């Protein structure tokens, strides 16, 4: 549909508005009728920092095609997520970088994907392998971070934005984080029972870090 209008409640005010669009652009936003035929809401699309796949498309799977990425992206947009960081989780580092490189090549081929996929989120393999903290990640391929990994990651994704999630208590984490922030990579720290002292040490780095409390699950026999 190249043009049209919709009456709905504005997400910020809850008041009815009438929105008109043409050729993919909003051309008018004005107060709407007090009584709406359909009680619906209108809001900007969301931006998600972690999308591992959608609509039957698993980004962790090898051999994805341009059509696969477009399918997932269009379904996300239909459901309210307009832009996102494509996320890969723990795997052997070489396999992870190969997969990331292929996904970047596909993304760079399409203006639609370049608009939607703002960057990349690498979650692992530098996480805790302790039971209850590795979640869906394979603890057998967890490893300690090294500045070499950071160089390889930046080489694969070029100047694209990238978010790297790691556990700060892993050996070599401080050096890897210093290297990461020096090349513009945002680091997200996930906590484990031994992370507090590591976080205090890392806090001296004068660059943005994102802190997140790791979801903890009780082990039930």
Residue ranges and their predicted role:
Residues 96-111, 175-186:
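Short, electropositive alpha-helical surface patch
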């Amino acid at each position: 549909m190249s043009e049209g209008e919709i009456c709905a409640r504005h997400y910020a005010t809850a008041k009815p508005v009438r929105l008109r669009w043409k050729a993919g652009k909003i051309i008018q936003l004005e107060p709407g009728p007090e009584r709406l035929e359909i009680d619906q809401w209108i809001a900007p699309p969301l931006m998600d920092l972690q999308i591992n796949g959608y609509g039957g498309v698993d980004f962790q799977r090898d051999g994805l095609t341009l059509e696969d990425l477009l399918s997932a992206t269009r379904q996300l947009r239909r459901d309210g997520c307009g832009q996102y960081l494509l996320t890969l989780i723990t795997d052997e580092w070489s396999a992870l970088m190969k997969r990331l490189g292929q996904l970047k090549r596909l993304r760079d081929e399409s203006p639609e994907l370049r608009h939607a996929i703002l960057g990349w989120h690498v979650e692992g393999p530098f996480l805790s392998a302790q039971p209850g903290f590795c979640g869906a990640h394979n603890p057998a391929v967890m490893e300690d971070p090294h500045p070499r990994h950071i160089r390889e990651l930046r080489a694969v994704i070029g100047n694209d934005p990238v978010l790297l999630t790691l556990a700060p208590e892993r050996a070599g984490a401080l050096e890897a984080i210093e290297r990461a922030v020096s090349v513009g990579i945002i680091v997200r720290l996930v906590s484990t029972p031994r992370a507090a002292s590591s976080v205090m040490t890392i806090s001296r780095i004068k660059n943005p870090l994102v802190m997140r409390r790791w979801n903890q699950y009780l082990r039930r026999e």
